[in-house]
Amino acid sequence: MSKGPKFCPTPNSPDIFDLKIAVKDLTRKLELQKHFENSPSNTEDDPLKIKSNYVPPQSSDMVFNTKIKEIKKTAENIQPVRPTHYNITAGERNAITSLQNNKDIIVKTADKGSSFIIMDTSYYKSKVEERLNLTDLYKTHEKNPDNIVMNRLNTFINKHKSILTKKEKLYLKNPNYKTSNFVAYPKIHKSKFIAEKVQNSNSNYIQMPIPPDLKFRFIHAGPCSPTNKLSELLDSLLKPYLPKIPSYIKDYNDFLNKLPNYEKNEMDDILFATCDIVDMYSNIEVDLVIKSVTYWICKFPTLLHSRFNLDFIIEGLGIVLKNATFQFNNKFYSLQCGTGTGTQVAPTIANLVMGYLEITLYEKVKIIFDENIQKYVIQNWKRFIDDGQICWKNSFGDFNKFLEILNELHPKIKFTSESSEEEISFLNILLYKGKSQIETDIYYKKTDTHDYLPYSSSHPRHTKNNVPTTLARMICQIVSDEEIREKRLHELKHWLLKSGYKSEVILNCFQKFENVDCKDLRNKVISENEEEKIVFIQLHNPNNPQIFGKIKNIFNSLKEYEGVEGTFSNTSLIKAEKQPLNLGRLLQKSFFSMEPRLPHGVKKCQYKKCDACKYIPETNVVNFKGHHKLFLIKNHFDCNAKNVIYKISCMGCDEFYIGETVNLKQRISGHKHKLLSEESDVQKIYNHISFCAKNCNIPFTIVPFYQVKEESLTARLTIEEYFIKKYNPKLNTYFYEKPNFSNKKRKLDE
C-alpha cells in the first residue's frame, strides 16, 4: 500500500476479450470514415457530443473490405504470450486479496491526497450513520426510490421532447443507471494530530488511535445515478456562464495569471487572506440555485444554446437536485436539502450561486467602504469553488469587516478565514512578499508524502515518462524565484528517484523547462496537430499479444493503395492504452454493506410487481444444449441485471439463443411482447418458441450468465459473438441465413 492508490499491479492473465473489442471498435471507426468520406460534415451543435452506435453497411471498395478483414483477423486465434514478471511479489498479491476480503477494516483514499487510510469498519459505519441521521439533510426510504426518480425523469423528457433530439432523449433516459452509494473520505490534511504524527515519522505508514479532529468529505451521488445524464447536459449548458463571474478561476494556472501586481511601496500594506466556505454543498438550497441560474441566464441570454430555454434549465435542475438518492448499508436515502456533491453539475451551480451572492458583496463593500475599494474587490477577490483569496490592503481598514460582509450574504453560507502579513497558501500555491513584488512558491500539505506513481507500476511507459514532465512543469509555472525553483526541482528529483524513475529520464524532462520564464509557461497555449487521428484503444497489459504493429502495417498499406486523394491520406493511426485496475480501485469499494456478500449465480429480485421474475430460473450454472461442460456463473445477477450476455431457452425443446442487453428487465419485456407480435422481421424465432412451447405455462426462460465490464455496445456485441461461435446456438442461426445480419440482430435486441 506504500506504493500509493495509483499503482497498477501487473494483470494476472491476458485479456483476449479486450483485444477483440479494441479491434472491432477500430474497424468500425475506419468503416465510418470510409462511409462518410463524401458526405458533408455534421454541423449540428450537440452540447453533449453523444457517441453514436451506428454501424455502416459494407463498402463497395473491395480492397478496403479486404484490409478490414485482415485487421479483424489479427484478433482471431490469438495465443496468449508467456506471462511477464509481476511487479509485486506473490505475498503482496495475496495481501491484496486478504485486504479485499477482510470485513473488519475498510480502506479509503485520503481526501486531497495520495495516501491510503485503513479504518475499523465499525468506526467508518458510525461516522457515516452519524451524518445520515441528520434528518434535516437526509430522508430514509423503505425501498429503493430510483424507480420513482426514473418516472419523474421520463415525464420531464416527454414534456420537453420538442427541444431534445432523438439521441438526447435516448441518452437522458439512462437505461444503464445504478443506485448511487454514500461514501466518506477522510480529510487527513485538516487533522493537526495526523499532521504532527506524519512529520515526526520516518516510516512508510503511521499507526495511531482515532484522531478527535478527523473530518470527512461526504459524497452522495454517483456517475451512474438515474439523473446523471441530465446533470451532464445541464453542466454543458451552464459552463459558458462561468467566465462571466468576476471572481471565477478555472485552476491554479488561471489564478497565477490573475494575480495582481503591486508597486514596491505597496508591499508593506498587503495582508494575505483566504476564506473557506463551511460545508458549502449541503447549504446551497434549491431555491437559491434557481434564483442564481435565472439571474445569469437573463443577464447573458445569448450564451444559452439556441435549442434550450430557461424553463428547461430550471425544471431540469429541480429534477437533478431534488432527486439525489443513494444507499448505505442496505438502506436507502434521499437528500432533503442542499446539493448532491457527486453530481456533475454541482461545481458549476456552486460557482453560479456564489457569483450571484458576490453581486451583493460588491454592493455592500461600496456602502461600508467606498467605490474605489469596491472596484478593487471586484478585480482582486478570486475564488475556486468554495476557496476564496484576496490580497487585502490594510489601508482599506479592518479585514474583519470584509469577512463580516461575506458571512451576511446568506444565512446558511458561512466562511472561515486565515490571514497573514508574510505568507499564505491557496490551492497548491504559497504566496509571500518578495523584495518588490508578490512571489509564489509551490505548496505541499503537511500530510503530503510525495509518493508519486512508482515507475514499476503497470502503466504505459509514455504515461510514466510524462510524470516528471507534468510535475516539473507545475513547479516551473508556480515558483517565481529562480533559486527556489532549482531547489524545488532538486527535491522533486529526489522524490522521483525514490519512486524508481531513472536519473536520465528525470533530467530529460527537466531540460524542457530550462531558461523558460514562469510567465511564459503560464500563458503557453498548446497547439493541436491538424492531422486527423484514428485511435486504437486497448488495455495496457504486458501479457497481451502485441498486435498493433500488424494493424498499423495493414493501415499504411491501405493508405499507400489509396494515394494522396484517398479517404485516409491525412489520417494517422495511433495507439492509446487504458490503465489496468490500480490499488485504489482494487482495495476500496463505494458499496458498503455489513451483510454477507451475495453469492454468485442468478436469483429472482423478489419484487412483488416484477413481471420478469417468472422467466428467470435461479441457478449458478448454465447448461448449453449439445455441450457437456457446464458454464459457471461468476457474478450475482437478478432481474435488474445490466450490461450482460444472456441465454434465452425454449421450454419445449431446450434450444437456445444468445443475446446481449443493456437492461435485462426491459429485454425480457421486449421478448415477451414479440412473442405476441405478428410484424417482427425475426418472427421465425418466436414462431419456433410459440409452437414448440405452446403447452408450457412459460414459453421461454432467460439466464444472464456473463457481466460485460465495459459499458458499450461494441463490447457487448464482441463478447456475444464470442459465445455464439463457442456454443453455436440453433436459434441464432436464423440470422446467419440472412444477408444483413447486424440489422436483423439489432431488431431482435431492441
Where do the protein language model's features map onto the residues?
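Charged structural interfaces that engage phosphate-rich ligands
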Residues: 1-750
